[in-house]
Amino acid sequence: MSTAIAQQKIRIRLKAFDRRMLDLSCEKIIETADNTAATAIGPIPLPTKRKIYCVLRSPHVDKDSREHFETRTHRRIIDIYSPSAKTIDALMKLDLPSGVDIEVKL
């Protein structure tokens, strides 16, 4: 049997359409973790998802005339090792932009 102690970890997944807003949110989270003596690893970039929508330009006849729109979803992961109660409280009070989706796993 292994005698290694399981280390506690928080995994934060971030998603956003705007890459700059996502990077600013990652910087805030890492800065908060560093200020509370926790170890932050990341941000680890995940593949960007592209969703393309094809729409007819004309409401009536011209099927050959189409327009394409796309949305890009940028994603990042941040791992925080050995978090304290102070770290968790600071992360809960953190004010992040509304365009960033955050998922936290303990």
Swiss-Prot record:
A biological process from GO: translation
Coiled coil: none
InterPro entries: Ribosomal_uS10, Ribosomal_uS10_dom, Ribosomal_uS10_dom_sf
Presence of keyword Ribosomal protein: yes
Gene Ontology molecular functions: structural constituent of ribosome; tRNA binding
Keywords: Ribonucleoprotein, Ribosomal protein
Tree of life domain: Bacteria
Signal peptide (UniProt feature, chain positions): none
Protein family according to the UniProt entry: Belongs to the universal ribosomal protein uS10 family.
Self-association state and partner proteins as the record states: Part of the 30S ribosomal subunit.
Record's function text: Involved in the binding of tRNA to the ribosomes.
Protein name: Small ribosomal subunit protein uS10
